Structures are given as C-alpha cells and as structure tokens.
A protein has these predicted regions:
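Blade/loop signatures of beta-propeller domains
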Residues: 42-96, 259-272, 431-435, 501-502, ...
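Blade-level signature of beta-propeller repeat domains, shared across WD40, Kelch, NHL, RCC1
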Residues: 578-660
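Repeat-blade elements of multi-bladed beta-propeller folds
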Residues: 68-72, 107-128, 156-183, 207-231, ...
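Beta-propeller blade signature
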Residues: 186, 191, 232-243, 328-351, ...
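N-terminal cofactor/phosphate-binding cores enriched in small/glycine residues
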Residues: 77, 81-200, 538-539
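Extracytoplasmic beta-rich repeat domains
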Residues: 100-111, 145-168, 196-211, 248-296, ...
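Bacterial signal peptide processing site
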Residues: 25-28
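Short, conserved, GDST-rich strand-edge loop motifs in beta-rich repeat architectures
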Residues: 221-233, 281-282, 308-337, 474-505, ...
C-alpha cells in the first residue's frame, strides 16, 4: 500500500467494502461540490404540542425491574438489572427461548428496549425497526416493522460499518437515527411516523449511528463522520413535534459551541472562553475539525445536564493540525484542537455548555473521546461525590465531579505508552514523544491502538458497589505512519495515515475486567482469544454477561470472574446484552452479527491481502481468523429451561410508513 498514490491510499484506508471503496475513489474525480443541505423537515403548523414529563416517565420505567426502558436501562447508563431469577446457582440451566433474524447482515451494535410486554429494536442498515409482543412464553410475535427511506450514499461514508446503536422511548414514541441522517419519531403502538428531522447529510460525509436519548421532553442526537472531514454537531428536538430546540458545534467560536458565560468556572485550567475552538487549529482547520459525538449520552435529571464525548479532530496526519514542527511545540496548548476529544456537560433546556474537559488535547492517535459517560455516586477521599466515569479510548479511566468537571481520578486501565500519566493539576496528559506520531513518514508504535483500550462497547456497574466497572477491553496496539495530505474535497476520506494493528499477546485479543476506578486497579481479569466487542450487563443474580467476536455468549460470577455458563451464537457478538421480565420469566437478550470497525473487513468483504484496509482492521482480522466467523443479524433471548423457537420476522408484521408493506420494506432501500 505504501506505493499507492495518495488518492488510492485515502480510499483504501477507509474502505467499507470493495465496491464502496471504488465509489469513494470515483468521487475524487468529481469537480462539483455537494449541494447545500436542504432545510430540516418541519411539521405542519399547529398549536404548540403539550410537553410530556419524560423524566418522570423514564424514572418510573427504570424503577420497574422488569423493564429495560433506556439505552443503558437508566439515565446514568449503568447497564445494571435488579432482576435475580437467573443467578449463580441456576444459570447453568439457561437455554434459548426464541430468536429472530433482523433482515440485515452488517454489524449489530446496540441493544433492544423492553417496556411492559413489548420489545423494540433497530437493526444495522437498512435500519429495520421492530416491535415484538413478549406476552407469550418462548415466543416473540412481530407487531409491526418499519424501514426508513434512505439516501444510499450514506453507506459509502459510514465509518466504520453501517451500525446502529439503538432507540429511545418516551410518551408513546420510539425515536432513533437512520444512517442517512434522519432523526425519526415513530408511534410505538403502530410504527407510523410522527415526525422526522434531518440532522446529518451524507453528501457532506455525515451519518447517524448513535442512539438518541430522550430527556426533559427533548431528543438529543449527534452525527458521525470524523474520517470524512465533518464538523461535529449535536442537536436537540422537542419530542412532541420534532421542532429543533438547540444545535451546538464541536469547533468554531464560543457561540457556535454554545459555551456559557461561566464555562469551566471551577476549572479554568481546562480552558474557558476566547474562541479556542477556532484559535487552536491552524489554517482554519476548525472548519473540518471533527469532534463528531457519535457515541453514548447520559443525563442527570436533578442537575438537568446531558453528558457526552466528542470525537477525534479531523485528519489522522497530525502535523497538519499544528502550526509548529516539533512535538514539544505542538504540546504547549496552543494547538489543542478544541473542543474535540472533550467530555461535555450541557444544560438540557438550552444546550449551554457548563463544563468541558479535553482528555486528549491535540489528539495524534485517533483516540475518539466518545465512549459512554457513566453516572454514579462515588466515595472519593472520604467524600460522597456525584461523579461521571469514562473509560476513554486513550486507555485512561477518568472520574470527574459531574457538577463542575473537577478531575478526581485518571488511571490507566490498559497498557498505554503514549502518555506517562495525567497531570491532575492541569488535567493534561504527560505525552511521550517516542510514541507520539507527528512527522509525515515517521512510523510510531503506540499503545493502545486507534481502536482504543476499549471502543464504544459499554461497561456496566452495580450501583451497590459503584467503584467497580465491568468492561470488555482491547489487547492490541498499532503502528501509525502519518502521510502527506491529498485531495480534501467535502465528503471524501479525510485520514491520510497508514495503520497496522498488532496483538499485545498472542491468543488473547480481548480481556474482560472488573476495574476499580477509585483504586485504579483490576479486581479480576478474563483473557479471551477473540476480541470482546460487546457491552457488558451486570445483574442482581450475581452475574456479568458479555459476548465475544467469535460468537460466545458468556455469564461469569461478578465477584470472581469465574465462568458459569456459555453458548455459541451463529455470528460474532458486538451488541449489548440486556435483562428483562415477561410472561413470568426473567430473560437475557443480545444481538449477534459481526461487524463494527473490528469486524468490518469480514462484513464488507475487504481484500485479505491489504493489511492497511479499514484503517488497519483488515490486518488484525485476517491474521487472526475473523474471516472464519459467519455473517449474521439476529436477536437471541434466553431464560431458564427455554424452549428454543425461531420467529419469522415478517410473518405477522403490518405495513409501516417509510417503505411499503412490511414483507418487502427492507428491499426498498437497498
């Protein structure tokens, strides 16, 4: 690949599939810039819609142990279930209850929702949405199916893979994002569209893969597209009618980013006002500065603050994002590329940023800062502190006071050689120049890789022991070789780096950990041959559930890590397990379907001979047998002594707006 032209190289690095890579290359030859985006779709003029008390409704759903009513079950993304019918003593009798295909065969991240006796779920592209009746034992009856109309250009600019991380529910509405950029609210009973708003524009390199959240009567969502030179953006819409409440950028002026007058008042060392979102980029790089917030969002209903992280700052060849020439000069703070790589706290009513902490200033490794911000109360130095915890891709587990952004802990949870430590006074990492890529053509070995100490796969925590988090982590590093910048037309790959992924330890690509964020050490660890790219689930039955890329779904003792149960699913697991109760039984459910960045070389059929394909994922995949894992796209449910039935997804579905009859809806967008 080193002998390729820059034009071919850019496309090969970000290839989502052979055909899509060719389509991306073809765009380099187009002279015309994309048309300006159309105005967001607005509902017909009507009287102001009543605002539902969604916070109280969500709290009621979460208080019912039978439900999995939110993305992480609760506002804080704890991914903890109080159910205990399935426990250490009887989990050995856990068997398949029923399973169903989703009519999609790309990577299945995310998780279903369960409210009452209904399950809701969203597939990978084409984003089939299902409502399933759970009232019958060992059976899932499809109530309706909806497939949105989409812009197929989104597939070619979806980094990395055409995944979807789920939906949210409140006030009788189910809300999700389509890959081609629509935030869509459906009537949860019928599957009919209530409203649709355009947030992302594929012609500009933008997509939606995240799961919107519903808080304070609003829907909050963000875009993807950092590898295509986008400018990150988060917006909020009224749940009742879809009217936009606010929209804030990740880069640009203080006004663009919605920084409040008291931004970072408690921690001025983290950066305050002064248009740093412009000034810390050379040559107006902020206009393509990345910072897309494509990960997970949490919410504190008492503080009325929403929390999320922003992604990497544009192209991966870092010298273009610094106005100087040496590592020392680029690490002074002058070229931090703010506010990429930042954990933000925003007021839900206005979008005003109360505080922001940039974890990896002047990111040189693609350590996207979008991982889940988990809300817990912790005892820190003898005091009870309302905290936000983030296991960042850069390999550090951060603990901050979620009220004002004060940094309380920052400990390595995986090998991380790019930084010695985090300076707790300034909040800045103490970088190691030898492991910090900068000059074009100089290869650097860095731990962890760009895929992170862990990627977006979410951790779980039991609130009864809120310092210990259960996480699947990545056990490999990378060789990163920055390249010269080529064509930078809007909507084209914006990377310009060669990346190779290398295992830290043969035969142990994944490690599941119980990690104490206060003490900064693991309580136990489990080594897995294949990556652990699923999220984890912890239950009051004393169990932690997780899945592996080669399809093993496992339950272990949460106190010791001892394996208590396992079953093999037909494809790799990159989805997040949930627990719920229906028809008198506790169930555990999870998606299977290999994909995501880790499985993209398999899901998209990339060239086994190009180890740099999919930003280095191809070399890792084909040298470690990922190509032997079958493709898939199913939801699986388990209970004690389940009957093991297969449900036909379109057998009883009814037509839903957006794609014709349910039986053929999936075909209309391909």
């Amino acid at each position: 690949m080193h002998s390729h032209s820059r034009r071919t190289q850019a496309c090969t690095l970000l290839a989502l599939a052979t055909a899509l890579a060719l389509a991306g290359c073809k765009k380099h030859e187009e002279a015309a810039a994309p048309a300006a985006p159309a105005a967001a779709q607005q509902p017909p003029a009507a009287a102001p819609a009543a605002v539902a008390d969604t916070d109280s409704e969500f709290a009621t759903n979460a208080a019912n142990p039978d439900n999995w009513g939110g993305i992480g079950r609760d506002f804080g993304l704890n991914r903890h279930s109080p159910l205990a019918e399935i426990n250490r003593d009887n989990v050995k009798n856990l068997k398949m209850s029923w399973e169903m295909k989703t009519d999609a065969t790309r990577g299945h991240e995310g998780q279903p929702l369960v409210i009452g006796s209904t399950m809701y779920m969203v597939s990978a592209y084409p984003n089939n949405v299902f409502a399933i009746d759970l009232s019958q034992e060992d059976n899932g009856k499809v109530l309706w199916k909806y497939t949105p109309q989409q812009d197929e250009r989104a597939v070619a600019v979806a980094c990395c893979d055409t995944v979807n991380r789920g939906a949210s529910y409140a006030d009788g509405k189910l809300v999700f994002g389509s890959l081609s950029g629509d935030v869509i609210a459906l009537d949860a009973k019928t599957g009919k569209e209530v409203w649709k708003q355009k947030l992302a524009y594929p012609e500009k390199g933008e997509t939606i893969t995240m799961a919107p959240i519903i808080a304070d009567g609003k829907v909050v969502a963000g875009i993807s597209g950092n590898e295509f030179g986008v400018r990150g953006r988060v917006a909020a819409y009224a749940l009742a009618d879809g009217k936009q409440a606010w929209s804030c950028e990740a880069t640009g002026t203080d006004k663009d980013i919605c920084l409040g007058p008291d931004f970072n008042k408690a921690n001025p060392q983290h950066g305050q006002l002064g248009d740093l979102g412009e000034k810390t980029y050379p040559d107006e790089g902020w206009k393509r500065g990345g910072g897309a917030a494509w990960g997970w969002y949490s919410y504190d209903p008492k503080l009325k603050l929403v929390y999320y992280g922003t992604g990497n700052p544009g192209l991966w060849s870092p010298s273009y994002r610094c106005g100087k020439t040496t590592q020392k000069e680029c690490d002074t703070g002058e070229y931090d590329n703010k506010w990429s790589m930042t954990l933000f706290a925003r007021k839900i009513d206005t979008g005003e940023a109360v505080w922001g902490y940039q974890k990896t200033p002047f990111d040189q490794w693609d350590y996207d800062g979008i991982n889940e911000p988990i809300l817990v109360d912790l005892t820190i130095d003898g005091k009870q502190v309302p905290s936000v915890v983030q296991f960042d891709r850069n390999g550090f587990a951060y603990v901050l006071d979620r009220r004002d952004g004060t940094l309380l802990r920052a400990n390595k949870f995986v090998p991380a050689n790019w930084a010695e430590r985090i300076d707790m006074k300034t909040g800045r990492p103490v970088k190691v120049a030898a492991h910090s890529p900068l000059e074009r053509g100089r290869k650097v070995e860095a731990f962890p890789s760009a895929m992170g100490g862990k990627d977006q796969q979410p951790c779980s925590v039991d609130p009864a022991n809120s310092a210990v988090f259960f996480c699947g982590t990545n056990n490999w590093h990378m060789e990163l070789d920055p390249q010269e910048r080529g064509n930078t037309m809007m909507g084209l790959p914006y990377v310009f780096a060669n990346v190779l992924m290398k295992p830290n330890e043969p035969g142990a690509l994944g490690i599941v950990k119980a990690f104490d964020v206060v003490e900064g050490k693991s309580k136990w660890e489990i080594k897995e041959k294949f990556p652990v790219w699923s999220g984890t689930l912890v239950t009051d039955g004393g169990l932690v559930f997780y899945g592996t890329l080669d399809g093993w779904f496992r339950a272990v003792d949460k106190d010791t890590g001892k394996k208590l149960w396992e079953t093999k699913l037909p494809s790799g697991i990159i989805g997040n397990p949930i627990a719920y109760k229906a028809n008198g039984h506790q169930y555990v459910a999870v998606f299977s379907g290999i994909g995501g960045w880790i499985g993209l070389p398999v899901a998209a059929g990339l060239d086994p001979g190009d180890p740099y394909g999919a930003l280095g994922a191809a070399g890792l995949a084909f040298s470690n047998g990922f190509d032997k894992i079958p493709l898939g796209g199913m939801v699986h449910t388990f209970r004690i002594d389940g009957a093991g039935k297969t449900v036909t997804p379109t057998a009883t579905a009814t037509a839903a707006a957006g794609g014709g009859s349910a039986a053929v809806a999936a075909k209309t967008v391909r």
